[in-house]
């Protein structure tokens, strides 16, 4: 699906035109170790069209670089089901307790979020990219009621 606007000089993409976006999510557990769970998430999307603030889209536009990201995670069930610890008074209200480690943006892609526009003395506008965060680690503790 494309979102284009017809102008005198031809077709110009609208600011929301993203030509493709592909996402993948995979989650599984290790058969010999059912308390462990692994997840993989990948996203690859086309860049959005941008134009300088003082110029119209018809005068000139460009696309941001593609958005790419890969996340992985590993979780372990600490308690749940028939585990002995679940018989203690504090844990009786929980179905299960999980601890997990995630790595966001595993491949450390430098994705562009937006642009800061710098105007020179000749009124030319230059786009300076603002990048999203790089690789991050996340430790989580999850309680299911």
Enumerate the predicted regions with their spans.
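Gram-negative outer-membrane beta-barrel transporters
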Residues: 1-51
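Extracellular loop and loop/strand-boundary signature of outer-membrane beta-barrel proteins
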Residues: 7-13, 57-62, 124-129
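Residues embedded in well-ordered secondary-structure elements
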Residues: 15, 27-29, 61-63, 90, ...
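Residues that define the transmembrane beta-barrel architecture of outer-membrane proteins
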Residues: 16-22, 66-70, 95, 133-137
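Glycine-rich loops and low-complexity Gly/Arg-rich segments
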Residues: 21-23, 51, 62-67, 123-128
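Transmembrane beta-strands of outer-membrane beta-barrel proteins
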Residues: 22-24, 36-40, 72, 97-101, ...
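Extracytoplasmic gating/loop element in the C-terminal half of outer-membrane beta-barrel translocons
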Residues: 29-75, 84
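C-terminal beta-signal and adjacent terminal beta-strands/loops
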Residues: 43-53, 76-145
């Amino acid at each position: 699906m494309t979102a284009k606007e017809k102008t005198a000089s031809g077709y110009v993409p609208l600011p929301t035109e993203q030509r493709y976006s592909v996402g993948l999510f995979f989650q599984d557990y290790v058969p010999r170790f059912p308390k462990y769970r692994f997840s993989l998430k990948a996203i690859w999307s086309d860049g959005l069209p941008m134009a300088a603030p003082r110029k119209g889209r018809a005068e000139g536009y460009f696309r941001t670089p593609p958005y790419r990201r890969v996340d992985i995670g590993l979780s372990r069930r600490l308690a749940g089901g028939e585990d002995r610890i679940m018989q203690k008074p504090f844990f009786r209200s929980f179905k299960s307790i999980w601890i997990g480690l995630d790595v966001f943006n595993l491949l450390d892609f430098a994705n562009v979020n937006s642009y800061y526009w710098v105007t020179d003395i000749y009124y030319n506008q230059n786009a300076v990219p603002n990048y999203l965060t790089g690789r991050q680690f996340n430790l989580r503790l999850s309680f299911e009621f």
